[in-house]
Amino acid sequence: MKQGIHPDYHKVIFLDSTTDFKFLSGSTRTSSETMTWEDGNEYPVIRLDISSDSHPFYTGRQKFASADGRVERFNKKFGFKSSNE
C-alpha cells in the first residue's frame, strides 16, 4: 500500500439519535465526542438521524403508497373494478 494517500481508518461508535441504538464499526469519519464501548475502550461517536434500528423499511412500519397508473385512472373513470381489489 502506498503511504500517505489513504484516509485514517479506525473504529467508531455509531449512535442512532432516535432510538439510542449503538453499534461499533470502522470508518474514516471522526468526532470530538467519545464514548466507552462494552469492551472498555473509548471510541469517537458519530450521531445518526436514522439507522436500521429506526428506518421504517427495516422495522416493518413501512407504508406503501399506491400510485395510480394510467390503467387505474381509466378503470376509475369508467367504473371498472380495480385490479388490486
From Swiss-Prot:
GO molecular function, one term: structural constituent of ribosome
Single GO cellular component term: ribosome
Signal peptide location: none
Keywords per UniProt: Ribonucleoprotein, Ribosomal protein
InterPro entries: Ribosomal_bL28/bL31-like_sf, Ribosomal_bL31, Ribosomal_bL31_B, Ribosomal_bL31_sf
Protein's GO biological process: translation
Family note: Belongs to the bacterial ribosomal protein bL31 family. Type B subfamily.
Subunit structure: Part of the 50S ribosomal subunit.
Name the UniProt record assigns to this protein: Large ribosomal subunit protein bL31B
Organism field: Macrococcus caseolyticus (strain JCSC5402) (Macrococcoides caseolyticum)
Gene that produces this protein: rpmE2
